[in-house]
Amino acid sequence: MAKKSKIAKAKRIEATVEKFANRRAELKAAGDYAALALLPRDASPTRIHRRDHLDGRPHAYMRKFGLSRLNFRQLAHEGKIPGVQKASW
């Protein structure tokens, strides 16, 4: 499990990105890069790092399911992810 502070930081960055999204789009469309540089650093969407929704693990993240490979495997074995079954050939 990730540190609680890292999970909280990721949520804070996501909120900041959402808060400044419209303003960033307007400034980029106008080409006002000086004003864009004055916005908070965390307002840029490139600062978002995807994390597992269950435990906050930052690595081995599967976008389609919003889980890390470890939690995906566990939930898939338990049959809790619809449409996912173990391969057999």
UniProtKB/Swiss-Prot annotation:
The keyword Thylakoid does not apply. One of its GO terms (molecular function) is rRNA binding. InterPro entries: Ribosomal_uS14, Ribosomal_uS14_bac/plastid, Ribosomal_uS14_sf. Keywords: Ribonucleoprotein, Ribosomal protein, RNA-binding, rRNA-binding. It holds the Pfam family Ribosomal_S14. GO terms for cellular component: cytoplasm; small ribosomal subunit. Disulfide bonds: none annotated. Binds 16S rRNA, required for the assembly of 30S particles and may also be responsible for determining the conformation of the 16S rRNA at the A site. Part of the 30S ribosomal subunit. Contacts proteins S3 and S10. Belongs to the universal ribosomal protein uS14 family. This is Small ribosomal subunit protein uS14A. The gene is rpsN.
